[in-house]
């Protein structure tokens, strides 16, 4: 389905845990959100009013696919910090040390 300037996008404004401008920033990370596209809130309706990028406007299918990827990325487990990894290793060393000492 085509996504057009002038379209009421209220039905897809909240899409897979993100709002539409967040999804567009995910799709076009080098964009200027305040310039490259524009939405207007018209009495609770979200109207897509401008697209100033050289790339074609993404289709609704592309937007939905990107929204799903963004949702998965947001829900992905965060990598452990160095301190957390060191603490885990210290626990493993303590456990293995107790096992070795217990066999002697």
From Swiss-Prot:
Where found? Cytoplasm
For the keyword Ion transport, the answer is no
Q: Does the keyword Cytoplasm apply?
A: yes
Could you tell me what induces this protein? In response to low temperature and salt stress.
Q: Which GO CC annotations does the UniProt entry carry? A: cytoplasm
- Which keywords does UniProt give here? Cytoplasm, Stress response
| Superkingdom to which the source organism belongs | Bacteria
Major localization class? cytoplasm
Q: Which InterPro entries match?
A: Phage_SP-beta_YorD, XkdW-like_sf
Xref: Pfam families: XkdW (PF09636)
What is the name of this protein?
A: SPbeta prophage-derived stress response protein SCP1
The organism named in the record is Bacillus subtilis (strain 168)
């Amino acid at each position: 389905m085509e996504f057009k300037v002038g379209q009421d996008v209220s039905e897809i404004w909240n899409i897979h845990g993100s709002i539409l401008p967040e999804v567009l920033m995910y799709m076009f990370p080098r964009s200027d959100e305040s310039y490259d596209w524009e939405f207007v809130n018209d009495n609770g309706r979200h109207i897509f009013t401008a697209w100033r990028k050289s790339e074609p406007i993404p289709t609704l299918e592309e937007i939905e696919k990107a929204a799903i990827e963004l949702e998965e990325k947001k829900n992905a487990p965060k990598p452990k910090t160095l301190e957390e990894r060191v603490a885990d290793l210290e626990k493993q060393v303590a456990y293995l040390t107790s096992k070795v000492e217990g066999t002697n």
